[in-house]
């Protein structure tokens, strides 16, 4: 988590070279990581440090709060869609597992690409739970866009998580009665 906080801190704390952190992965000499992920997360700390008179460490906690809200919203949407389109009992089990799993709690506020992919995967799966025939193009577009955004902005290897959805769209057509492939 803190390895990604350092470039965010560098982007938001521009008081001088002595106050900002910099890691070797982001130095132009090596440049093995993209600044896009850090820049995307630097918006909240930047606004906190510029708009308020709070100390710089408040930006750290504000960003973690925003990450917790994103995780909670994506998991709540997934729970709602599982309850609506799968079964209420399955949704209750999902809720229990999401609530008591220590790894999920720890990952929900971590500034890591894998945690970001966790949010986008939960959100994409919430869209994918909707029956294919009820949302027409929106289900396909939103699910594909969120899976792609998670892979492009977070962790590229996470695109494999979309494989079951892609298989359903291409081969099974969900529950769409007008599907010509069946």
Language-model regions: role of each:
Residues 2-29, 36, 40-51:
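Extracytosolic helix-loop segments that constitute the early lumenal/periplasmic catalytic or substrate-binding loops
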Residues 4, 10-13, 71, 75, ...:
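Hydrophobic core segments of transmembrane alpha-helices in multi-pass, intramembrane catalytic enzymes
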Residues 41, 45-49, 75-83, 102-105, ...:
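Hydrophobic transmembrane alpha-helices
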Residues 106-117:
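Short acidic/glycine- and proline-prone juxtamembrane loop motifs at membrane-interface regions
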Residues 126-149, 156-182:
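Perimembrane helix-loop-helix junctions
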């Amino acid at each position: 988590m803190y390895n990604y906080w350092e470039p965010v801190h560098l982007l938001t704390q521009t008081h001088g070279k002595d106050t900002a952190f910099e890691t070797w992965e982001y130095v132009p000499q090596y440049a093995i990581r993209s600044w896009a992920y850090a820049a995307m997360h630097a918006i909240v700390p930047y606004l906190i440090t510029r708009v308020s008179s709070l100390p710089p460490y408040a930006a750290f906690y504000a960003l973690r709060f925003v990450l917790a809200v994103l995780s909670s919203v994506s998991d709540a949407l997934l729970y709602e869609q599982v309850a609506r389109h799968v079964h209420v009992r399955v949704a209750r089990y999902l809720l229990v597992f999401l609530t008591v799993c220590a790894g999920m709690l720890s990952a929900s506020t971590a500034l890591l690409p894998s945690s970001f992919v966790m949010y986008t995967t939960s959100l994409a799966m919430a869209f994918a739970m909707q029956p294919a025939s009820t949302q027409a193009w929106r289900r396909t577009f939103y699910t594909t866009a969120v899976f792609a955004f998670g892979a492009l902005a977070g962790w590229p290897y996470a695109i494999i998580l979309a494989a079951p959805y892609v298989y359903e769209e291409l081969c099974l057509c969900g529950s769409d009665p007008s599907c010509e492939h069946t």
